[in-house]
Amino acid sequence: MIDLKHGDCLELMKEIPDGSVDMVLTDPPYGTTACKWDSVIPFEPMWEQLKRITKPNGAIVLFGSEPFSSALRISNIKQYKYDWVWEKSRFANQMLAKIQPLKIHELLHVFSSWKVQYNPQGLIEVNKVTKQGKKVTDNNGGGVRKSEYMQTHTNYPRSILRFKSESNTVHSTQKPVPL
């Protein structure tokens, strides 16, 4: 069941029970345009509510773009885990093309109070023994220490995600569903 609500997110989140959400995925305003709706949500009350509603091992994933992204990560550095980079198929800042590079990416920031669940997609099973040599320097001139391990899979996801930008969207910042 989908229950859509319209209103102030900080007020609406107060209706959500403590520790009841597995994952929050949201695209907050970045405060990088002159649009009326593009006002940054105050970080302190936002984090207070997000931490309250999320399960201990739950994930909080927020879209962002600089300089908003840096401020967002710093605002909750203790829970910050890593970023994904969404490489879009269309650039966004054509009006600034003569003074800065065209922006063709957005960031997804992953936060969690504990070890965030990570389920890599698209793995290929290999099950082979891999040897790894490592140069070791010590007081006797160094040497090579070799180790073996069982590599079970390959094709692990990388930090850059490539998904086509949506066209004819309902909202100007709408993201593609497959992303």
Locations of regions flagged by a protein language model:
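Core catalytic lobe of class I
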Residues: 1-179
